[in-house]
């Protein structure tokens, strides 16, 4: 579990949880209440 900002814009392994401009997290990540979770 990694903390993330409201926009879910964190980086994991060099890739953003949610690329800028995207409304949903990608790369196997999901944002839940300011947390980026691996799914």
UniProtKB/Swiss-Prot annotation:
Cellular-component GO terms for this entry: extracellular region
Q: Does the keyword section mention Phosphoprotein?
A: no
Where, if anywhere, are coiled coils annotated?
none
Matching PROSITE patterns: HWTX_2
Detail the disulphide connectivity of this chain as listed in its UniProt entry.
4-25, 8-31, 17-36
| Protein keywords | Calcium channel impairing toxin, Disulfide bond, Ion channel impairing toxin, Neurotoxin, Secreted, Toxin, Voltage-gated calcium channel impairing toxin
**What's the chief localization of this chain?**
secreted
Annotated tissue distribution: Expressed by the venom gland.
Q: Name one GO molecular function term.
A: calcium channel regulator activity
Q: Which InterPro entries match?
A: Hwtx-2-like
Looking at the Swiss-Prot or TrEMBL record, what is one Pfam family this protein matches?
Answer: Toxin_20
Q: What is the role of this chain?
A: Inhibits voltage-gated calcium channels (Cav) in rat cerebellar granule cells. Has insecticidal activity.
Q: What other note does the entry give for this protein?
A: The primary structure of the mature peptide is identical to that of venom protein 1 from Brachypelma smithi (AC P0DL80).
- Put simply, this protein is called Omega-theraphotoxin-Asp1g
What is the scientific name of the source organism?
Answer: Aphonopelma sp.
């Amino acid at each position: 579990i990694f903390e993330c900002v409201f926009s879910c814009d964190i980086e994991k392994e060099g890739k953003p949880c949610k690329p800028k401009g995207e409304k949903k997290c990608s790369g196997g990540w999901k944002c839940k209440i300011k947390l980026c979770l691996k799914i």
